[in-house]
């Protein structure tokens, strides 16, 4: 199957290009039209011979304007109050309606998936409760990570992202801090799988977060 890459910003699309030979790549950062031109994007990839697409990297939602027929279809399906997840679901539905399959980054490069088990050191507690909190937060479509500080304090990720959450934890003088990050239960992991990497680890170390727990197989480990 000929797979094309729709590349947003960040490390993930760069890593994928290093690991996977894509039939065609479209860099959304240099795409000359607004991202509302969904039909044009789809036609470009199909004309290049792509039978499936991998969507990877961050995209500025503010560029979703000047809708063409495909963009209008996506906007109407998602609804006027749609969050990022609903918009992505509608985008996937459009591509699939046009006969283009969607492949996740973790599918085209399975080694990126966070493996089960303890990667370094030793784990002396059951991480289930922290992961449950992270999933509950994700179910509210707010964030994907929580940090347990000391005995009773929990910090929750918001729209500012995981690194901002970690910085907030650095302001808490607790001896023990643990980060938990999990996929949102409702999210389509083909296009929206949570990521982590050296930047996450460095930020955590600086903030005094000594233990990092990531949901196995449902998060991507970058540059590790």
Task: Indicate where each model-derived feature is located.
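Hydrophobic beta-strand scaffold residues
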Residues: 23, 101-102, 211
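N-terminal glycine-rich phosphate/adenylate-binding segment common to multiple enzyme folds
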Residues: 38-109
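Feature captures the catalytic cores and cofactor-binding loops of soluble hydro-lyases/lyases
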Residues: 29, 33-50, 67-80, 164-224
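A short acidic, amphipathic alpha-helical/loop segment
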Residues: 13-19, 54, 203, 223-224
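Gly/Ser/Thr-rich loops at beta-strand to alpha-helix junctions
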Residues: 7-12, 58-61, 219
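Redox-cofactor binding/interface segments in oxidoreductases and associated redox assembly factors
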Residues: 5, 55-56, 181, 214
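Conserved mixed alpha/beta catalytic, RNA-binding, or beta-rich assembly cores of soluble enzyme
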Residues: 2, 6, 11-13, 81, ...
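N-terminal glycine-/serine-/threonine-rich phosphate-binding loop
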Residues: 1-47
């Amino acid at each position: 199957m000929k797979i094309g890459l729709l590349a947003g910003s960040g490390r993930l699309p760069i890593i994928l290009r290093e690991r996977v030979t894509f039939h065609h790549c479209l860099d959304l950062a240099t795409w000359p039209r607004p991202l509302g031109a969904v039909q044009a994007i789809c036609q470009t990839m199909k004309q290049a011979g792509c039978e499936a697409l991998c969507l990877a990297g961050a995209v500025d939602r503010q560029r979703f304007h000047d809708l063409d027929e495909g963009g209008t279809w996506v906007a109407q399906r998602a609804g006027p109050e749609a969050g990022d997840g609903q918009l992505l679901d509608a985008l996937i539905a459009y591509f699939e309606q046009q006969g283009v399959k969607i492949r996740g980054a973790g599918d085209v490069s399975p080694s990126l998936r966070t493996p089960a088990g303890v990667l370094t050191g030793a784990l002396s507690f059951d991480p289930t409760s922290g992961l449950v909190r992270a999933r509950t937060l994700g179910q509210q479509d707010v964030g994907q990570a929580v940090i347990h500080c000391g005995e009773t304090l929990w910090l929750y990720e918001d729209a500012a992202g995981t690194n901002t959450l970690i910085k907030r934890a650095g302001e808490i003088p607790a001896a023990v801090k643990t980060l938990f990050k999990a996929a949102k239960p409702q999210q389509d992991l083909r296009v929206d799988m949570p990521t982590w990497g050296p930047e996450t680890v460095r930020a955590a170390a600086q903030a005094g977060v000594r233990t990092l727990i990531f949901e196995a197989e449902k998060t991507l480990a970058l540059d590790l």
